[in-house]
Amino acid sequence: MFLIEKRRKLIQKKANYHSDPTTVFNHLCGSRPATLLLETAEVNKKNNLESIMIVDSAIRVSAVKNSVKITALSENGAEILSILKENPHKKIKFFEKNKSINLIFPSLDNNLDEDKKIFSLSVFDSFRFIMKSVNNTKRTSKAMFFGGLFSYDLISNFESLPNVKKKQKCPDFCFYLAETLLVVDHQKKTCLIQSSLFGRNVDEKNRIKKRTEEIEKKLEEKLTSIPKNKTTVPVQLTSNISDFQYSSTIKKLQKLIQKGEIFQVVPSRKFFLPCDNSLSAYQELKKSNPSPYMFFMQDEDFILFGASPESSLKYDEKNRQIELYPIAGTRPRGRKKDGTLDLDLDSRIELEMRTNHKELAEHLMLVDLARNDLARICEPGSRYVSDLVKVDKYSHVMHLVSKVVGQLKYGLDALHAYSSCMNMGTLTGAPKVRAMQLIAEYEGEGRGSYGGAIGYFTDLGNLDTCITIRSAYVESGVATIQAGAGVVFNSIPEDEVKESLNKAQAVINAIKKAHFTMGSS
C-alpha cells in the first residue's frame, strides 16, 4: 500500500501541569464525543503515574461483525481516507458515504488451524491499512496513537459461538486516531501537547497549529470543578437476574464441570443505575478505588468509565516482550462496622485467601491458561511466570495475581497477539472456547464492553490494554455495571453471588455518591 511520503508533521508544545486530569478533561473536552482519558497508578501506593488524553480525534474506527466503518472527524482525517480509497484490498468490499468508508471483510474460516487463522484477513487489518498509509519516518512515540475499546463480543468473529441478543450500541471495537494528544507525567510533573498532521493540506496545518496554541492557553486558565447535580430522589439498583437466578445458573454450570465439559467458567450479571453525570462518577471512583488502569471514554453512542485492576495484554516493541496479568481469587476487604479498615481482620482475610485450596487451584489453572495463550505466539523457550500468587488490594476487594511474560514471535505484531489471546481467561474460564460458548448460552445476551479490553496501540508497535472490569457502560442515561465470579467444581454458589456484587460495589457506590445525597438508596 502506498505511503503518504513525508507528509507526517508533528507539533509538540510543553504546557502547564495540572495534578487532576479529570478536571483537565472536563475543561478541554466537555461532553464532546471521540474523546478519551487513560490513566495509570501504582498498585500499592496508589500514586498517579501517567495520564494520556485524546482531546481531538482525526478518525473514528468501529466494527460490527465483519464490517468496519472509518469516519473522518476532520479534514486531517479525511486525508487518510483519501489514501485508503485509492488502494482498496481485492478481497474487501468497499463502500463510501459522506465522510465515511465501510470495509466489508470476508468471513473467517473457523476450521483453519491456529497458525493459519492468525494470518487470515480480518477486521484487525483495517488498523494495519491505516498505519501503512502514513509513513512515520522519524519513528516518533505516540505520533500515530489509537485509543479505544475492544469489546468482549469481538470474539464471535473468530470463534463459533451461539448467537446472542445485542441490547447495547457498543460496537465490536471502537478506536479514535488522536489528532491532538495530551501526555501528562505525574512523577515529573510535566505536560506535553502533541498534534499530528496526516496530510499536506496547508489550511489544516495552520488550523492544527492554532488549535495546539489554543489548548496551551486553556491550560493556563483556572480550571473549573466538575459540576455535581445531586438529587434526594431515592434510586433503586436493579439487576438483569436475581440472586436466586444467578445461583441457579452457577449450579447448572457446576453440573457441566462435574461431567468434564469445562474446568472453570465465569458467568456474569448486570446491575443498572441512573447516571447522567458520568465524569463526576468517574472522579468519585478514582478517589475511592485508584487502580493500575483508569479510563473515561466518551463516544457518540455511549460513555464508558472504570478503574480496572487487571492488565489485558501489554506489548513492548523494543524488546518484543508480551505480558498477561491473570487475576483470580477475590475477597472483600476487612472492615469495622463503621466502614473503616480493620488491619487485623484484613490480614486474616488475606491469609485465608492465600491458603485456600479452591482459590489457589482456580488461580493456578488460569495462570496455566495464560501460559498456553502465550505459547502459541511466543518464541520457544521465552515464556515464563515472572510473578506468582501475589496479592493486590483495592477499596472493596483484594485479589490473587500473577504475571506471565514471553517474547513475541517474529512476523507477528501486537494486534496478532491480542486476536490470538482474546478474551482473557479470567473473564471466560477454561477450556476457553467451550467456556465462552456456555457463557453465551446461559447469559443469552452480548457482554459489550465488559470483559473486553480498553487501552491504546501505536504504529511503532506498542500496545497497552486492561480488561474492562470494575466499569460502567452508560447509554441513554443508564449505567450498566457488569460483574462475574469464577466458578469451579467446589465453588459455593452463595459465595459467588456475593462476590459478583462485591466486584461491582466500588462503581455502584461512585455513581451513587456523584448523583445522590446521603440518605438516598
UniProtKB/Swiss-Prot annotation:
Q: Name one GO molecular function term.
A: anthranilate synthase activity
User: What InterPro entries does the annotation carry?
Assistant: ADC_synthase, Anth_synth_I-like, Anth_synth_I_N, Anth_synth_I_TrpE, Chorismate_C
Pathway(s) of this molecule: Amino-acid biosynthesis; L-tryptophan biosynthesis; L-tryptophan from chorismate: step 1/5
* Coiled-coil residue windows: none
**For binding Mg(2+), which residues are annotated in this chain's numbering?**
E362, E499
Question: What's the record's note on cofactor binding?
Answer: Binds 1 Mg(2+) ion per subunit.
Ways its activity is controlled:
Feedback inhibited by tryptophan.
- Catalytic activity reported: chorismate + L-glutamine = anthranilate + pyruvate + L-glutamate + H(+)
Instruction: Report the EC number(s), separated by commas if there are several.
Output: 4.1.3.27
Task: Quote the Pfam families the UniProt record gives.
Answer: Anth_synt_I_N (PF04715), Chorismate_bind (PF00425)
Q: Which domain of life is it from?
A: Bacteria
Q: Give an example GO biological process.
A: L-tryptophan biosynthetic process
Where does the record locate the signal sequence feature?
Answer: none
Alphabetical keyword list: Amino-acid biosynthesis, Aromatic amino acid biosynthesis, Lyase, Magnesium, Metal-binding, Plasmid, Tryptophan biosynthesis
Similarity field: Belongs to the anthranilate synthase component I family.
Question: Which PANTHER family would you find in this protein's record?
Answer: AMINOBENZOATE/ANTHRANILATE SYNTHASE, ANTHRANILATE SYNTHASE COMPONENT 1
* Subunit structure, interactors included: Heterotetramer consisting of two non-identical subunits: a beta subunit (TrpG) and a large alpha subunit (TrpE).
Record protein name field = Anthranilate synthase component 1
